[in-house]
Amino acid sequence: MVGKRGLILITCQNSDCEYFLVEEGKNITKNGHNPAGNQQYLCHHCGRYFIETKNTPLYHSRLARSEVILIAKHSMEKTSIRGVSRVLDHHRDTISKYFHLIGQHAEMLNNHYIRDISAGNCEFDEIWSFIHKKNKNLLPDDPYEFGDCWTYTGFKRESGLMISFNAGKRVEKTCEIMLNYFFERMELPLPGNKISIFTDGNCQYSNTLQDLYCDSCMDYGQVIKSKEQNRLVRVIRERIFGNPEIKSISTSVVEGYNNKIRQRLSRFTRKTASYSKRMIGYVNSMNIFQFVHNFIDIKLDHQTPAMLERVTDHHWNWSEFLCHHIQL
């Protein structure tokens, strides 16, 4: 006698199927295991088989799942590509390949889950690094991405959720792209439920924020710090739009999280041989950091920033991160 069909959590992973990633209306059954021991499924809509690791960094992986998890963990603990290669005894090209796959996977999950974040107090700041070489060593025919690289980051103050980032030259376009990502991932504020935004004195933010939010829905303040001989001598807090409380105008939270980036990612260290050689590796490291910070790292009360914002209802682990499939 045929038993009752068990719950199937995965959706069809065949991109040409009309039920690709679609939960409602799917018709999938388990169909044994492949020679590597991975669960195999059959989609009755497209009539094609797929395994549980398809569309994840573990698909067609020659390394064991535990090894791939170790690569991901080491990448977030200030270890360089060659350092991970020495520790795990795999070629650096293998480490780079998995690092790229994990970065793409993290970007997909970030784009899918970080949505409709409620309005609140948000802080923006920039963090400096460089690609391949510093500005003072640039040659006229070097690629545009070489030299100084600034990462614009946006965090929510109460939960510590990293909402958006963008990396590039320190120009208004780089800031604008980050703010557009931020705008798409936030709920629209209302006059009765304003969004409060705080930055340093960089005028790039104010120029773009005026295009995204109306004055009645936004409180925006800047904190301007003056230094003499590298010592802080004066802090000025200014209202730019709306009516934010003067004492709440601060960027201490985002500065703290940017410091966490420097502590966790070796390529952000100021004097290092682990600097990024290409922009794609730089962005991959930030995508992984964003997901790990939001979904895996505990913030307070045994909850992650994503749990505090009700983006997820549980604490993710590394295995779940690498094996997860999104559902539409």
Question: PLM features: what roles do these ranges have?
Answer:
Residues 1-328:
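Residue-level recognition of single "structural anchor" positions
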